[in-house]
Amino acid sequence: MAKNVVVIGAQWGDEGKGKIVDWLAEEAGGVVRFQGGHNAGHTLVVGGKKTILRLIPSGILHESLDCFIGSGVVVSPEALLGEIDELNAAGVKNVEGRLKIAPTCPLILPYHIALDQAREASRGKGKIGTTGRGIGPAYEDKVARRAIRAADLLHPEKLREKLDAVLAYYNVQLQHLHNAEPVKAEDVMAVIEKVAPRIAPMITDVSRVLNEKNKNGEKLLFEGAQGALLDIDYGTYPFVTSSNCLAGAASAGAGVGPQMLDYVLGIVKAYTTRVGSGPFPTELFDEVGVGLAERGHEFGSVTGRARRCGWFDAAALKRSIQINGISGMCITKLDVMDGVETINICVGYELPDGGKTDILPCGSDAVETCKPIYETMPGWRESTFGVKDYGALPENAKAYLKRIEEVCGAPVAIVSTGPDREETIVLHHPFA
């Protein structure tokens, strides 16, 4: 029996992870974020009411459920408290009492944001598509061993010493490399002094609590952010995020052993989208792509940026299945494909040397040269929106799902037919 489930995005993010985590959370004893920051939003719809979460795990709407932010997450204190305030205003109960933050979480502070935005502005046409929220610089500090972490909020005198040293490093870059204004220590301390009293009580040994819950037989749900094809190591580098987005990162990012990760659920959109720069072999530039974007409301929930849309890329998904060890797939937004007369599935790529491959190459330079090889399938006119029974799906929709399974080599466990948590078809429950 699977006891703990890891949910990851299997494409370039925006696959619909939030809804599925919220849905699975009904059976969990805890939900854990293990990587990323507040650079992407997870959208939940319950009873027609929309909630967008950026840092807080998507299980927070279940009012008796503990939620955890593991050490693999970089935390903006201001963004976190803003999110808590939004949930409080919406009537969600005891958010601060149920939210636990690892003391080892690196903090995102004003100088991270300043450098992130200054760098992106300096890149000109070479922009990598950063959200400008300080995620990358915060991860740099972690690796360079100069990060200010959540635990430092408990020791303001030592924190100030660390801050002075960090700002000396940052301000040289801001002033002399990017011709930007320096960040003042007093301004950063003002932010810290404002947020510390509220965040300090939430700081908890997350690793210990999770291991105790597991020992006591409670089911845990690990919630990934972004998508596997944005992974810092295996994504389309350098057009990637700054963290490891793979299922394996749940172990290090939450502080649990890999033997605790029983089932990996890959969230997969029924077509493909990407935000920002980077190669995208199946991207559509015609009315079909426009239609997918309009019907799928393909705009970032945090940034508002339009998402690029394209055909389903099974070759890219095969790479994701391989590097994540995906146990089962959840296909989301199947209803967006309603009415598409003819559907293409990318099953491989032609390479510049005349060869072929059935799996996404590594790195953006190699992917940019790939020409998609398509299989064509008939679409369906019937509506799949809100369908909750697999047998009620149109025959061509079922054939589409079956072909995805065959080409990718992983089973479809769940099908999402709408944004609400109830608009879900279950073929195999990950916790079963």
UniProtKB/Swiss-Prot annotation:
**Pfam families the record matches:** Adenylsucc_synt (PF00709)
Q: Which residues bind substrate?
A: S301, V302, T303, G304, R305, A306, R307
Keyword field contains Secreted? no
Q: Which residues form the active site?
A: D14 (proton acceptor), H42 (proton donor)
The record's subcellular locations are:
Cytoplasm
* Uppermost EC category: ligase
Q: How is the cofactor bound?
A: Binds 1 Mg(2+) ion per subunit.
Residues annotated as binding GTP: 13-19, 41-43, 307, 333-335, 416-418
Where, in this chain's numbering, is Mg(2+) bound? D14, G41
Task: Note the superkingdom of the native organism.
Answer: Bacteria
Known EC number = 6.3.4.4
Q: Which GO terms describe its cellular component?
A: cytoplasm
Q: CDD domains in the record, alphabetically?
A: AdSS
**Major subcellular location class:** cytoplasm
Associated pathway: Purine metabolism; AMP biosynthesis via de novo pathway; AMP from IMP: step 1/2
- Purpose: Plays an important role in the de novo pathway of purine nucleotide biosynthesis. Catalyzes the first committed step in the biosynthesis of AMP from IMP.
Family annotation (NCBIfam families): PRK01117.1 (NF002223), purA (TIGR00184)
Q: Which family does it belong to?
A: Belongs to the adenylosuccinate synthetase family.
The UniProt subunit note reads as follows: Homodimer.
Name-wise, this protein is Adenylosuccinate synthetase
Q: Which organism is it from?
A: Neisseria meningitidis serogroup B (strain ATCC BAA-335 / MC58)
Name the encoding gene, please.
purA
